[in-house]
Every structure is written in C-alpha cells, then in structure tokens.
Amino acid sequence: MDLVRLTSLLPPSVMGGPTSPRPLWSNQGLPFRFQSKNRFSPVAAARASHAASPAELYWKIALPTSPMPGAIRDLINPARSASQEDTDMDEVSTDAVFFLEKDLFPGSKITLHFTRGGACAMVLLRGRADAIPFASEKLPEILTQLSVPAGSRAAEDMRTTLAECEAALLGARDQAKHCVTSLESMVEFAAASLGTRDIRAVSTEVIGTGAAETPRQEYTVEAVKPVVSVSGGNMVTCHGMPYAYAVFGCHTTTATAYAVTLAGADGTRAEALATCHGDAFPGVAEAYERVGVAAGSVPVCHIMPLGDMLWVRN
C-alpha cells in the first residue's frame, strides 16, 4: 500500500501534526554532509517526537505481525545516522570474514569487526523517492537535486551504485534481483519474491550500544539456530549500497541462514546473522580460497554486516 493513500486514512493527530503528515525530507532538496565511511549522512536530526513516523506507521500496517529490525530503525532515526563515526570504507570487514558451516557451533570463536553496510542515509518513502530520478543518464540532475558536488567521491559512489543497479537487471536468471529506493518497494519486492505478505525481516544487531561499529575482536559463539525451519527455502537478502539516501540491492537466495548469539572479549554482545552457501555462488571465489576448500565443495559462511537485511516467510 502506498503511504500517501495509507496516511490519508489516518487522523492528523496520529501523524504528529495538526494538518498533513510531515514528509521525511523537505521539498526544497536533501542536504547531506560528506563522511568517509559511506559519504552520506543527514546534516540535521528531525524534530524529536513521541508520535510514530510515517515509515513506522507504514510498517505497522503493512507488516502488523513483524517487528521492525534494527537495520530499518536506524535508517528512520536521523539523529543516530548523523552521529555515526567516520570510518574508511576500505576497513569495512564484517562481510569479509568467511568460515565453514561445520565450524559454526556453541563455543567456537570468530574474530569480527562489526561495521555498517553501504546504506547509512535515511530511508525514503515511495512518494519522495519516486520524485527523484534514479538512472545513470540522469546523474547530473540527481546530483543537483540532492546537493551533492559533481566530481566528489560521493558523486562517484552514486555513479557506481546506479551502474550496478542497472546491471542487475541483466543478472543471473536463477535469482530475482532489484535495487529498491524506498521502504515500500523493499517490502513489496520481498513479498513478491517469497509469494506471501506474511513475511518478516531480520538483521545483525549489536546489543546495548549505539555505536556505528565495534572494534575488531574475538567473539565466542553462544548459540546457533536456523532462521527458517525449512532448509533450502527461498529468502531475500538486501544489501546496503552507498547513495545519498538509503538504497538496497535485493535478491533471492537459497542460502541457509542462522541466528548466532555472540559474546565479545570486551563484553559486547551481538545477535548476528550468518548465511551459508553450499554452491559456488558468484563473486566469492576469494571466500573458498580463504577457508582452503574447493569452490562449492562444502558450505561456506559469512556474517551479514550491520544494516543489511534478510527477509523470510513467517
């Protein structure tokens, strides 16, 4: 359901204002400041309010039985996004740690550096996102509209993301792939791919800290349980991509997913998602080289970074 139609049915008091609902962004453009990690972050936090945001209202109505994962909560909380520490993107390493599925058990050790994925800027709703072009040929217009300096590293990241999203349309035939630019389009892609609207999203979450990352350290695996009970069932993964607002590259997968409880040496605790691939999935030959096995011979796993999401049937 489109948020414009959805919110038109709600009284003004529910929307936190006396008249029409406040958009996530002003119609006068989107101000951003450069950050070395993802290069995009809102400059100013939204006015504090106890009223639910439009994004939260949409979620509650579209997915009433599904808790909102931390990855989404962070993207509708501009105060948290704006406070994230600068980190060189070359240091992002959570999803570069690979291990064998047989080594994922209570008591095993994994050295990790939790960092956020590509999406750090605020998630938009469809009405705002659809008003902004999303095509390589429109990049100059996009940069002007979003106040991103042409020739900047941020602009180059946006160019790369647009090119990758356009290439995804010509991708592998055995996977549904799509770049989503709004919360509604993500929910609808996941629902269409899984064949039901009775779905939920899960994400890696570090417990009890608002930091954008954690130090690299050894974690002890305390518990492991499958995310879905039926092995081999389709899931949808959404990976954050660097852009001036939240953009995710989503695709179907038949990987096996586990919810993993981790305890860090410094007391940090995390509920992480591990995905294990039993075939030679594209682009990760390096993963098999690192664990010292032939590609596709045994399942190889990785921890999903903060900010990425996994969608499954309830």
Curated annotation (Swiss-Prot):
UniProt keyword annotation of Signal present: yes
BURP domain ranges (all copies): 98-314
Tissue spec. comment: Expressed in shoot and panicles.
Secretion signal span: 1-16
Database matches in SMART domains: BURP (SM01045)
Domain of life of the organism encoding this protein: Eukaryota
Protein name: BURP domain-containing protein 8
Species this protein is from: Oryza sativa subsp. japonica
UniProt gene name: BURP8
